């Protein structure tokens, strides 16, 4: 089975063994958890009291350092240039020998969408640990289209409030995605933040 199911009868959950993800039924609700080589997550998907089971905590752990500020600044630079044309932009961040690598894939850009030209094996999409797209002048909020598209196990981000025509303070919004469910993340946990960039989840 690709998905496993557990009852939380003690505070110590067994190691994650499901090929995709696991549901945990706990005293404080239903949780979804998954792991990959560089991170693991346990996030709530339903808040409900279940008598006789042990409560479970939301957890997110990583085995990598923060994305350097120089890389974040480059993302802002490209996103700002796209915003001048009122286009969205797409970025992937992957790890190579423990170092972050920014990949800007060939992409189809419009005013309200952006898509990579390829998603197959060996593509930047397939390698990505972090996936970010920009919303130019629009707010840094995940849309229903984002929810439909962002169904893998990775960190997702959206950058908004990019207005190159005047002084601006762009905003980033991050979340960990666990196969169609999400939990917000503070950006400074993942990125070295440039002074100009604000965090939606810290406001």
PLM regions with names:
Residues 1-130, 137-203:
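Conserved beta-strand-loop surface patch within small alpha/beta domains used
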């Amino acid at each position: 089975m690709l998905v496993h199911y557990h009852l939380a009868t003690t505070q110590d959950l067994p190691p994650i063994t499901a090929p995709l993800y696991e549901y945990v039924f706990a005293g404080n609700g239903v949780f979804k958890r998954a792991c990959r080589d560089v991170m693991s997550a346990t996030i709530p998907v339903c808040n409900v009291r279940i008598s006789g089971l042990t409560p479970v905590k939301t957890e997110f752990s990583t085995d990598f350092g923060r994305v350097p500020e120089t890389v974040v600044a480059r993302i802002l630079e490209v996103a700002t240039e796209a915003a001048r044309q009122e286009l969205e932009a797409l970025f992937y961040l992957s790890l190579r020998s423990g170092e972050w690598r920014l990949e800007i894939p060939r992409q189809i850009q419009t005013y309200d969408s952006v898509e990579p030209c390829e998603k197959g094996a060996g593509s930047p999409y397939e390698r990505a640990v972090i996936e970010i797209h920009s919303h130019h002048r629009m707010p840094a909020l995940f849309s229903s289209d984002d929810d439909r598209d962002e169904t893998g196990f990775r960190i997702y981000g959206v950058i908004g409030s990019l207005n190159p025509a005047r002084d601006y303070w762009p905003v980033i919004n991050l979340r960990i995605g666990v196969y169609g469910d999400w939990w917000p993340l503070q950006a400074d946990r993942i990125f070295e933040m440039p002074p100009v960039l604000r965090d939606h989840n810290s406001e």
